Amino acid sequence: LASLKAVLSTGSPLLTQSFDHVHADWKADVHLASISGGTDICGCFLGGIPTLPVRRGELQGPMLGMDMAVYTAEGAEIRGVAGELVCRNAHLSMPVGFWGDDDGSRYRAAYFERFPGIWAHGDFASHQHSGGFIIHGRSDTTLNPGGVRIGTAEIYRQVEKLDEVVESLVIGQDWPPQNPNDVRVV
């Protein structure tokens, strides 16, 4: 591991324990960078920047050419609190559309409906005052038990405040099975 310079983590926010494990058991001076992007753009919105400090639980900043911010539901930019991760500029890896979506309506609905002209990626995030970002989970994963819309990130935020909880998963389950109009959150 002597020649190891960087480790990139992706898929979900890196747990504090995993961050500490890499530095304690792999290599203390490795550049450990969490990244966030998507298969739809074949790239990253946020990630590791070798010239910036690495902070446990944070992604260091926007990748080259990405004008990233966090918005409230009303479209105002916010710092230090959670909201919707957005990209405010066109970029080279944006898909130009969806296959079979001749009028572009599905494409616009997927990314640009929430904030016209601005890519909303579907991640619940906060832009820290340090400049880094924290990804809290998906914002577009919504449960709808009894007609009440609940974002899974809202539940994760509360559950993860408990020291006893290391990992959690939130799903909607039809309950009882013979009554599909009733959903319990597990």
Put a short name on every predicted segment.
Residues L1-R55, D67, E74:
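Gly/Ser/Thr-rich phosphate-binding loop
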Residues L8, A69, V86, L169-V170:
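Residues embedded in well-ordered beta-strands within globular domains across many folds
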Residues L8-S12, G57-L59, R88, P145-V148:
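Hydrophobic alpha-helical scaffolding
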Residues R56-P62, R114-G117:
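Short Gly/Pro-enriched turn/cap motifs at secondary-structure boundaries
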Residues P62-M63, A76-F112, I150-G151:
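Conserved ATP/PPi-binding loop(s) of AMP-dependent carboxylate-activating enzymes
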Residues T72-G75, H129-S130:
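Residue-level recognition of short loop/turn positions
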Residues H91, V96, R106-A109, G117-V186:
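AMP-binding/adenylate-forming catalytic core of the ANL superfamily
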